[in-house]
């Protein structure tokens, strides 16, 4: 049997920018993408801790080490700069393939917190 399971998440990231007139997506610091095993154009769910909004969008690679978490297009209406969000990626696994998700916790400046 195949199941849709959490593959990874970036936990409590801070929205640093938003651009309503962009074509859509979320821009994520490439360093965080690598740590969370999230690829450019991958589908992610974004959960806004401040207002409870949940939405899906795709990922654009941001400058590595910049700390950028930017909401683009329609998603820019769903959060404010400074809001904290959880960015979740999923994968389809069979029971033999599954491994626990990668969790990347970050500071208010979107710097990874070492385990």
Swiss-Prot record:
Class of the enzyme per the UniProt entry, highest EC level: lyase
PTM annotation (Pyruvic acid (Ser)): residues: 25
Assigned keywords, A-Z: Autocatalytic cleavage, Cytoplasm, Decarboxylase, Lyase, Pantothenate biosynthesis, Pyruvate, Schiff base, Zymogen
Compartment annotation: Cytoplasm
Active site: 25 (schiff-base intermediate with substrate), 58 (proton donor)
CDD domains: Asp_decarbox
Cofactor, free-text remark: Binds 1 pyruvoyl group covalently per subunit.
Cofactors named for this entry: pyruvate
GO CC annotations on file: cytosol
Catalytic activity: L-aspartate + H(+) = beta-alanine + CO2
Maturation and modification: Is synthesized initially as an inactive proenzyme, which is activated by self-cleavage at a specific serine bond to produce a beta-subunit with a hydroxyl group at its C-terminus and an alpha-subunit with a pyruvoyl group at its N-terminus.
Gene Ontology MF terms in the entry: aspartate 1-decarboxylase activity
Pathways involved: Cofactor biosynthesis; (R)-pantothenate biosynthesis; beta-alanine from L-aspartate: step 1/1
Pfam families: Asp_decarbox (PF02261)
Family matches, as InterPro entries: Asp_de-COase-like_dom_sf (IPR009010), Asp_decarbox (IPR003190)
Enzyme Commission code(s) on record: 4.1.1.11
Keyword Methyltransferase tagged: no
Single GO biological process annotation from the record: alanine biosynthetic process
Keyword Lyase belongs to the record: yes
UniProt: substrate binding residues: 57, 73-75
Domain of life: Bacteria
Role: Catalyzes the pyruvoyl-dependent decarboxylation of aspartate to produce beta-alanine.
Subunit relationships: Heterooctamer of four alpha and four beta subunits.
Protein name stated in the entry: Aspartate 1-decarboxylase
Source organism per UniProt: Kosmotoga olearia (strain ATCC BAA-1733 / DSM 21960 / TBF 19.5.1)
């Amino acid at each position: 049997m195949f199941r849709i399971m959490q593959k990874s998440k970036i936990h409590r990231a801070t929205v640093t920018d938003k651009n309503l007139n962009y074509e859509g997506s979320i821009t994520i610091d490439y360093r965080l993408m690598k740590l969370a095993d999230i690829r450019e154009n991958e589908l992610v769910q974004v959960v806004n801790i401040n207002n409870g909004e949940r939405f899906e969008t795709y990922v654009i690679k941001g400058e590595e080490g910049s700390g950028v978490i930017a909401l683009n297009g329609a998603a820019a209406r769903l959060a404010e700069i400074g809001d904290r969000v959880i960015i979740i990626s999923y994968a389809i696994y069979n029971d033999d393939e599954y491994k626990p998700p990668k969790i990347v916790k970050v500071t208010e400046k979107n710097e990874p917190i070492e385990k």
